[in-house]
Amino acid sequence: MAMADYYEVQDEETSVVSYDISVIPNDFNVMTINSLIESGVISMPTFQRNYVWDRKRASRFIESLILGLPIPQIFLYQIERNKYSIVDGQQRLLTIYFFVKQRFPRSGKRTLLRKIFDENGNIPDSVLSDNEIFQDFKLQFAKQENGDPHPLNNKKYHTLDVAQKSAFDLMPVRCMSIRQNKPEDNGSIYEIFSRLNTGGLNLSPQEIRGCLYRSDFYKMIYALNSEPDWRNLVGKAEEDDKFRDVEVLLRSYALLYDG
């Protein structure tokens, strides 16, 4: 089967299993959420997908927080005590993180950022200050219907006025913490990932695997996926957004292991 043809194969179906899970709602304000990201309590499933929002969409989300408008709830999966992985809401949480840092990732560098986040748990200041990777995060809005500029246009986190900054910092965000009680594995997260939509797009099984299983072997697979010889063999210079190229590598190693 040609590599291009493989990309067209339907993702596998999985059977439904019953789980005993606990779901606990928590309302964290925006700055608490940012602190949890900074400290690594909330980990970014960086193998899941790149940050895909543009500045206009990110600006609308930040505006919603400042105005106190309701936003979709965040779903977190409890891996262990004080350690959570994002099930649904990565784009929103990264937007908060980037806005507080006042830096917005350039579109051509987002695969690199995913790898940096996975290695460090956050993005070092030396990377944030690199203008080839980031630009200033200034809110971007069109003029209002009466022709006046939008009051938040070109605002950065530190240039918000006192009322705007306070509204943003203290805005509560509903976070649903999910913990699997039985069976004693992480199996339920597959079902949760597949049933929750992020931006209207379902996660592929390989994206789910990448979020769950982090090891030196997986790091090696993702590093190999970036190698020029492999990219030439695949016939695509850019890594696949749904990580189907990674899945080809993973299945190839599985075949070698099975003999």
What residue ranges belong to the model's regions?
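Basic- and aromatic-enriched surface patches that contact anionic nucleotides/nucleic acids
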Residues: 4-7, 15-27, 46-258
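C-terminal active-site-capping segments
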Residues: 33
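Alpha-helix boundary recognition
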Residues: 37-38, 66
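A short, surface-exposed helix-loop junction/capping segment
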Residues: 38-46
